[in-house]
Curated annotation (Swiss-Prot):
Protein name: CCG-binding protein 1
Gene Ontology terms for molecular function: mediator complex binding
Quaternary structure annotation from Swiss-Prot or TrEMBL: Homotetramer. Interacts with MEE12/CCG, MED7A, MED7B, MED9, AGL49, AGL53, AGL75, AGL80, AGL81, AGL82, AGL103 and NRPB1 (via CTD).
Annotated region (Disordered), positions in chain: 156-178
Lineage start: Eukaryota, Viridiplantae, Streptophyta, Embryophyta, Tracheophyta
Amino acid sequence: MIKSVTLRSFHLPIEFNDTKFVSRPCFLARSFPVVRCSSTRDVPKLELFSRGKFDRILQDPPLIEKAESELSDYCSTLEGDDSYSCWRAYFELKDLEREKPKVEVENLILQTGGLKSLIGCLHGVASMEKDNKTKNGLHVGEESDREKGMNLHIHIPDGLPKSEQELEEEEKSKMPDSAFTRLLRSKGTIPAWFSHAPDHETD
């Protein structure tokens, strides 16, 4: 930017020499222009104080992304249990973003007053969601087990002799008796807690 400024000459001009000052006779007053240059290239541009909603949406990152970024930066400054709790809240926020609608997550972030309150709020919401999933999972599991039991239950009568195939399978599944086991069977006495099989079950 170029500006033009007019300066007037002195009535008594003074000339400077190495040895003495010499004053010249008075000249007539006359004016001459002086050119001055000023540049505004290095001056930073300030943002407008009143930005529109559309401008903020275009320039600012989404609320959830901004909260995640601030939370990760805050967690990087912590140590120990505080750092663990902060990072757990960060991943809980990620889980909420996947499972819940975007509006609900944004309302949750707006309702909190800061990062510390956001961490506590995320822990509370995550614990409630975990309890609900556990209860619902147990309920569904019990119902499914009951239905499976009703569908797959087959009545097996007791007291019937085993078939030859079942007896062969039992004999094959048994481990071979050691010499000590055979000695106990032949010489040992029956303990008090042992009872013989009823007569109708013996062949």
